[in-house]
């Protein structure tokens, strides 16, 4: 079904306003990386909360300089208030203490450090933290638990990456951001396509069929292959979904023990 993106913008703005108000807040804060997802969330928040929507720019020691430039240009274009906190000194300490740390460990540390800054700012300014992860990332578990996946509310969490692109065009997100390869910018040379093995234009149709067909039952890879999807693609994507499903779940808490 073709989405009406102008109506979607109105819906998401209404969602943000009501959900923030429901939680007793008037201000919001979010991380702005210079990438597509955070740019979309930033513009939506600016539409609703104006000067009460604040962006944090948190470059690390390995962040690409052009990403910071793109974030600053977005703030200027849409009059977005922002604060910059460099996390480079902190990730340098981590690297010096854990010299054998993998790129994934370093990336996760940076993601969690950014979330620590966001929640500290939220406490200082009485603001609510807004998430910027899309549905493709969430289904694939392509994010850091208690890092970039952490938030109070998320306006784009049910939009696949390809849908976020379409929404971004309607919001007049700069072409520089629209055209850059998706990347979490967690280490030099990192990109979503390299990590996942496929572009979102290939992944998203499969994710949509998985959601439509297997919401209440285990994923059947044979059924997906019969729909015409490449078997290796199906195997890799379903494996990711199953391996990382726990990231979308609340912590399991033992029920109260009542001895007889």
Swiss-Prot record:
One of its GO terms (cellular component) is cytoplasm. Deamido-NAD(+) binds at residue 112. InterPro entries: NAD/GMP_synthase, NAD_synthase, NH(3)-dep_NAD(+)_synth, Rossmann-like_a/b/a_fold. One of its GO terms (molecular function) is ATP binding. It is an enzyme of class 6 (ligase). Its EC number is 6.3.1.5. Mg(2+) binds at residues 37, 137. ATP binds at residues 31-38, 132, 161, 183. GO terms for biological process: NAD biosynthetic process. Pathway: Cofactor biosynthesis; NAD(+) biosynthesis; NAD(+) from deamido-NAD(+) (ammonia route): step 1/1. Keywords: ATP-binding, Ligase, Magnesium, Metal-binding, NAD, Nucleotide-binding. Gene3D superfamilies: HUPs (3.40.50.620). This is NH(3)-dependent NAD(+) synthetase.
């Amino acid at each position: 079904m073709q989405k009406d993106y102008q109506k979607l913008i109105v819906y998401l703005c209404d969602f943000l306003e009501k959900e923030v108000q429901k939680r007793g807040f008037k201000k919001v804060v979010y991380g702005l990386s210079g990438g597509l997802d955070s740019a979309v969330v930033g513009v939506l928040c600016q539409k609703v909360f104006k000067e009460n929507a604040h962006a944090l720019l948190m470059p690390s020691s390995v962040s690409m300089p052009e990403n910071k430039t793109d974030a600053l240009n977005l703030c200027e274009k849409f009059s977005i208030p922002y604060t910059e906190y460099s996390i480079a000194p902190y990730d340098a300490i981590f690297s010096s203490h854990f010299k054998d740390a993998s790129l994934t460990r370093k990336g996760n540390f940076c993601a969690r450090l950014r979330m620590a800054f966001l929640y500290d700012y939220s406490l200082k300014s009485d603001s609510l933290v807004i998430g910027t992860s899309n549905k493709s990332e969430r289904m694939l578990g392509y994010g850091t638990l208690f890092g970039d996946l952490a938030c109070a509310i998320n306006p784009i969490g049910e939009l696949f990456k390809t849908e976020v692109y379409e929404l971004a065009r309607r919001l007049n997100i700069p072409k520089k951001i629209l055209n850059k390869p998706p990347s979490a910018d967690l280490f030099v040379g990192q990109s979503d396509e390299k990590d996942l093995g496929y572009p979102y234009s290939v992944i998203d149709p499969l994710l949509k069929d998985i959601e439509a067909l297997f919401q209440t039952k285990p994923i059947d890879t044979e059924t997906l292959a019969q729909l015409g999807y490449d078997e290796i693609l199906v195997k890799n994507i379903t494996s990711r979904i199953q391996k990382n499903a726990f990231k979308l779940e609340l912590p399991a808490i033992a029920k109260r023990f009542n001895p007889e």
